[in-house]
Amino acid sequence: MRKLWFLPILLGAVGGVSLYAIAQQENPAEEVKKQKELLLKEMGILPGDVYAEQGRDMFNKPMGNAGKSCSSCHGQDGRYLRGAYAHMPRYYKDMDAVADLDTRIKYCMEKYMGVGNVKHDLNFKSIATYVATLSNGMKMDVKLTHPKEREMYEKGRELWYARVGKMDFSCAICHDTFGGQRIRLQTLAKVKEDKVATHWPAYRFSNDQLWTMEDRIRGCYNQIRVTPPPHFSWPQIALSLYMAYESKGGTIETPGFVR
């Protein structure tokens, strides 16, 4: 098992070169490619994959008052969860609600494993990342068959187009109107064309952090100076569902490697 504390040592030892040593590229995609190649050359593995390995170990580790692990229900290494992420967010009968990856894991940990005060920390995100990798290579195929799924999708669509805050911005302004154009050091993704939901959770080399889609949503709200929705809240689930549905047909490849 590769320990998470090992990462800062490795990253700091990349030939004395920081993650920003590569000059700002005219093509942001080329910069991502070179950063990726640099890390693979010096470390032999990408940080996101290290976190996913850690997540697998935690997936099989008992925790909480019930003395159960995630694998107690979902099989060793999550063999019964293969392909599950490709259909998320979705409606869950035991919750009588629609849940994204993060919210579903939190619910399982609390209800079935007896874990109290679940936090959206690095350990939690490592588990989420590992679960997502179990759908790698599969097509995103979120459906809207249950009434609550359709309702949540519509809420997500409304949030997507809602102009908010002093900057009067919306998700759509950045990712529809100006999608494909460059802002600062990165290119704004287009939801449908870029199938954005297929590469989250992802490792962000710009801040050396592992992010789930919920973190990405919160980051966007912060950038437009609007108080972000809390983790595990319905706006998070609604926006995640909207993006996942619009990403249908895209091939899942997590953890992503992004700026």
Swiss-Prot record:
GO terms for molecular function: electron transfer activity; heme binding; metal ion binding; oxidoreductase activity; oxidoreductase activity, acting on a sulfur group of donors, cytochrome as acceptor; transferase activity. Binds 2 heme c groups covalently per subunit. Keywords: Electron transport, Heme, Iron, Metal-binding, Periplasm, Signal, Transferase, Transport. Heme c 1 binds at C70, C73, H74, C108. The keyword Cytoplasm does not apply. Its main location: periplasm. This is L-cysteine S-thiosulfotransferase subunit SoxA.
